[in-house]
Amino acid sequence: FGAIALGWFWLGLLFLALNRLADGLDGAVARATVMTERGGFLDIAFDFLFYALVPLGFAIADPAQNALPACILICSFVGTGSSFLAFAITAEKQGLSTQAQGKKSFYYLEGLTEGTETIACFVLMCAFPSWFPVLALIYAALCFITTGMRIHRGWTTL
């Protein structure tokens, strides 16, 4: 976040890669040893914070060009995140489970825009920071579609 906010996009890209490496390792360690509720909670909480901080960094780096697209992107992340978590909570209450996305600490509802796609978009944003507004708006549209898909899936499944 800080590197991106300061306009050091390549350093931001390095930190982004390190963050994703750490995120992947913590999940692998949990699956190889013991998965805990605390670990699952921290994993999802830090992921959603991370997803909001990257666009915020771009908004701070160039408010005139990036602030509105960053706000729209963050709003779209609220949609994907809230529909994802609302489904997981309700599925848990109803005793539903799946391992379609691998072994997870909660019901993992797939979507058009997931972690891999988000990271790919963030990589493009860091590599081509002048494209941020267009990339943010395109990705936000895809996230809003994902939100709609998840709401529909929740409505028809639960």
Residues covered by each model-derived region:
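A feature for the membrane-embedded catalytic helix bundles of lipid/isoprenoid biosynthetic enzymes
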Residues: A45-L158
